[in-house]
């Protein structure tokens, strides 16, 4: 600790310096009021704690000095010291912000506990600051998270013979005291009818967390809304257009930021699913009758994430959604779930996703989606997923 002391007893000053110096504390003891005030008001301001007598030269003057010191060192705890007969002065100092006080017994036994007392005050102040910062962090994260979640659709529509459900879930971190904080993130999904026959399904994921990721995904959401009226029936052209526009947005690509996107169009008459991936996971199909489950492509079928380079070309992939089957599109937070202490021993992964879907084969899609998130969370052994997760699950009836 860096300790500044204003003391009025030279003999005690030497002993205090000896006791506090045992733990290699950086201690400056001032034997005169003038020296103490010079150090406190004009000298170095980076003290961990200040200890001062509240009796000298007299209690009123000491209080005035204390107020000056408090004004100069708002973040530094000040501890007072007084003899037993002077304790009735303590209340005034405590009311004005003094953190604690020490009774100076005539035998000097107080010096044996001096370091412990000062250290406990410093630790208490640091803990309070950490709690304050943690609470401010929670408030800021919550406000950004609510802003981000405001663009998530709540009422989804599906064409005849289809059902659709979706879910977004933020990642979590733990801050002071182990309390979980739900992070503001950059995940996003949308489901809407392009026309009477074509249903759009998309999931997006902006890199990072916090305000930048949130604003990146809101920028993409705005662009999607602006150009969806063009009614692109070519998913690759749509994704390329979004990419070119995002590359013009500094909020997205500053500091290497980017967005992954899976954009698909389902034709409800032909049951054809046309999709384009910009760095997003490959869609999964689960045929309920046979329990066959598979990805619709490989990692090579995904293009470059959005916002990295303009003029990029993207590929169109076309698949038929079989009767009595389910189609899953998702962001990588679902698969990249792992226990914090077992990062190198695997993740929930595509295998975990497929096993969860198969286990929910006979359940309604809402239950299957709930089970998917539950199983992914369970894999983390309580630590929570470290990335946001967006999932859209589509069910085709016979």
What are these regions (language model features)?
Residues 211-231, 321-384:
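Active-site-proximal, acidic helix/loop segment immediately C-terminal to a metal-coordinating Asp/Glu
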Residues 29-49, 53, 57-59:
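Acidic, metal-coordinating helix/loop segments flanking the phosphotransfer/catalytic sites
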Residues 48-49, 99, 325, 332:
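Conserved acidic residues
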Residues 9-12, 54-60, 85, 107-109, ...:
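Short acidic, S/G/P-rich loop/turn micro-motifs used as interaction or catalytic elements
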Residues 7-34:
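Two-component/phosphorelay signaling modules centered on CheY-like receiver
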Residues 132-326, 382-398:
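… and, occasionally, acidic/histidine-rich disordered N-termini of signaling adaptors
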Residues 60-129:
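CheY-like receiver
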């Amino acid at each position: 600790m860096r300790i500044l002391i204003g003391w009025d007893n030279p003999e005690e000053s030497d002993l205090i310096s000896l006791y506090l110096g045992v733990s290699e504390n950086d201690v400056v003891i001032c034997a005169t009021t003038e020296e103490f005030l010079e150090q406190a008001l004009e000298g170095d301001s980076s003290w961990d704690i200040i200890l001062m007598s509240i009796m000298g030269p007299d209690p009123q003057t000491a209080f005035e000095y204390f107020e000056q010191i408090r004004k100069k060192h708002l973040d530094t705890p000040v501890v007072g010291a007084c003899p037993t007969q002077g304790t009735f002065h303590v209340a005034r100092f405590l009311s004005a912000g003094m953190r604690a006080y020490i009774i100076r017994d005539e035998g000097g036994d107080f010096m044996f506990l001096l370091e412990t007392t000062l250290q406990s005050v410093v630790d208490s102040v640091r803990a309070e600051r950490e709690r304050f910062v943690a609470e401010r962090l929670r408030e800021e994260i919550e406000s950004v998270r609510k802003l981000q979640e405001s663009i998530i659709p709540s009422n989804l529509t599906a064409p005849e013979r289809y059902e659709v459900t979706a879910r977004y879930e933020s990642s979590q971190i733990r801050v002071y005291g182990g309390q979980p904080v739900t992070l503001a993130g950059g995940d996003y999904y949308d489901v809407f009818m392009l026309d009477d026959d074509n249903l759009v399904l998309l999931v997006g994921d902006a890199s990072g967390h916090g305000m930048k990721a949130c604003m990146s995904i809101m920028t993409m959401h705005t662009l999607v809304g602006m150009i969806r009226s063009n009614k692109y029936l070519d998913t690759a052209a749509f994704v390329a257009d979004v990419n070119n526009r995002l590359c013009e947005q500094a909020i997205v690509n500053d500091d290497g930021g980017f967005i992954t996107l899976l954009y698909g169009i389902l034709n409800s008459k032909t049951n054809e699913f046309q999709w384009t991936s910009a760095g997003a996971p490959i869609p999964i199909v689960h045929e309920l009758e046979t329990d066959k489950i598979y990805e619709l492509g490989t990692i090579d079928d995904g293009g470059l994430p959005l916002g990295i380079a303009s003029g990029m070309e993207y590929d169109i992939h076309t698949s038929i959604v079989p009767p009595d089957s389910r189609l899953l599109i998702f962001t990588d937070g679902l698969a990249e779930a792992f226990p914090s202490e077992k990062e190198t021993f695997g993740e929930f992964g595509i295998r975990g996703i497929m096993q969860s879907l198969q286990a929910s084969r006979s359940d309604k899609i809402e239950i299957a989606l709930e089970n998917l998130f539950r199983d992914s969370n369970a894999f983390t052994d309580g630590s929570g997923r470290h990335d946001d997760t967006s999932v859209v699950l589509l069910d085709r009836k016979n």
